[in-house]
UniProtKB/Swiss-Prot annotation:
Enzyme Commission number: 5.3.1.5
Name listed for the protein in its UniProt record: Xylose isomerase
Gene Ontology, cellular component aspect: cytoplasm
Extent of the signal sequence: none
UniProt keyword list: Carbohydrate metabolism, Cytoplasm, Isomerase, Magnesium, Metal-binding, Xylose metabolism
Binding residues for Mg(2+) 2: 268, 271, 307, 309
NCBIfam families from the UniProt entry: PRK05474.1, xylose_isom_A
Taxonomic lineage: Bacteria, Pseudomonadati, Pseudomonadota, Gammaproteobacteria, Pasteurellales
GO molecular function (one): xylose isomerase activity
UniProt-annotated catalytic positions: 101, 104
Known catalytic reactions: alpha-D-xylose = alpha-D-xylulofuranose
Gene3D superfamilies reported in the protein's UniProt record: Divalent-metal-dependent TIM barrel enzymes
Amino acid sequence: MTTYFDKIEKISFEGEKSTNPFAFKHYDANQVILGKTMAEHLRLAVCYWHTFCWNGNDMFGLGSLERSWQKNSNLLAGAEQKADIAFEFLNKLGVPYYCFHDVDIAPEGNSVREYVQNFHHIVDILERKQVETGVKLLWGTANCFTNPRYMSGAATNPNPEVFAWAATQVFNAMNATQRLGGENYVLWGGREGYETLLNTDLKREREQIGRFMQMVVEHKHKIGFKGTLLIEPKPQEPTKHQYDYDVATVYGFLKQFGLEKEIKVNIEANHATLAGHTFQHEIATACALDIFGSIDANRGDPQLGWDTDQFPNSVEENTLVMYEILKHGGFTTGGFNFDAKIRRQSIDPYDLFYAHIGAIDVLALSLKRAAKMLQEETLQKIVNERYAGWNSELGQHILQGKTSLETLAQLVQQKDLAPKPVSGQQEYLENLVNQVIYS
């Protein structure tokens, strides 16, 4: 295998006392927690786009990162070299999965014919590398937002020919995902939204994207894809307002088009921040609506109004996220994909390892703390007591539709009900959480 990161062999677990920057302090893949290993709980994945495609550019500056494979004048040869380096990284980091967009792995070319040929060529290579390394595909997707043809959207575009081009990419990306054993297929509508309502037909665009998603579901069943379809919510950026604003919005959309049993959500932490929610809120909402699927692990900056895609570094935040996931029974086909990028000034190639090692340890420690909270029923006992009244005859009659507004009004008057407020104990609960996290 090509050696690009020749400074290290393989990242291993050395424990909390280790000072080796190229070692895990908390992530022991084989440690059993609540009946499953850490690896089985976390199902870690590295993303192709930020890790191997981004060159460090931003809106105000050119690329700052030295990536030899990006300098190859033969774009297809550069993509082959990128695949070599990507799988070297994945193998040395020791994660079980990776994720990609179609044009992350292969150059788009100048025609649909070139696009298909290039994509299939690299998929052949990825298939061989998966066999060689044992690394698997968590999910694939199609980039239907970067090319200028998508400036007015993909499925929501006013031109049906653009809709057809997006369908072509999704068709090929879904087929490749199935071929590579991908466990999910993600749909992120990067430009499925609007800049101004002055030139937008909201009803029409909603119907267009609804039909597009129905076609995706139809194709899934046609080819026998056994993985999970996922929509990734995001409120804005690059458009002013996106139709998949947050988890609750996506659920309403799925219900409208009869897709709530077919598609779940891939939740990104930074997107929750942009939507004005906590990461925990979005996870809890998805679990409550039974559409929780997978996670893009990263963090945003509350002081900034854009997608910073930083690596997760808060055990406090992720313990509560992990707690919600464990309560829900954990992942089925989903996992933690690091949709995160190193900072533009992090120009050492090994900064990629530092970033992923630190983030993986954060999730591992968060898992251990969340498992302790779940086992000790630290919070659940108080929540159960708080809602105990709904297990009474009155509560059950209300929920089962055995009473009415009139009946309840009569009951309150007859019994002169005067319910007394009970403390929510928020401060006490916060203390309990901190006690678990910092013990």
